[in-house]
Amino acid sequence: AAGNRVWLKPSERSSRTSGFLATLIQEYFHPSEFCVTTGGTEVAESFAALPFDHLFFTGSAGIGKKVMRAAAEHLTPITLELGGKSPAIVDSSAKLKDAAASIIYGKLVNGGQTCIAPDYAVVHASDCNTFVQELRNAAQEQFSNPEELTGAIDEHQLARWHQLVQDAVDRGAQAIPLITPSINTAPSFTPVALL
């Protein structure tokens, strides 16, 4: 209605999803309204260098800097969603069961790939053990079938996850399993753990 064209370049790490999106968009939209370009990092770098009216990017800070430099060449306004940390604050008056259920849902829905997915919780020390148990209960209740959860998108991300958990454990954290994969789960599935 506003005459704004959308040109989408999805992540090269999700090539099957990108291809599916491209097929759907081509079927339901005219290319003058919405189009999709797929490809690797070379395509992404070229894409960001085009003179858009506005550019949105979601990804890492390192790639975000490259996108911003490329967009600056044409003074293209840019919106960067570079992640960060989303805390969940659970004060001593909170209903721990409700808080745990909300946090587990927020973290695990869509494979945790939402910009507001909680990354950590700040909980009063006197409530910590009870809260951890409520998180376990909520995880097992909401996601009783581990096959419903999303695995790592590729081997690099799977290795990164294992490295982050091991680094935390090496520094004194305790890894508390919340959901354990079943035998039928894809090899890319990582146990859902609380650190």
Language model segments and positions:
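Rossmann-like NAD(P) dinucleotide-binding subdomain of oxidoreductase/dehydrogenase enzymes
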Residues: A1-D98
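ALDH superfamily catalytic-core signature
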Residues: F29, G62-L195
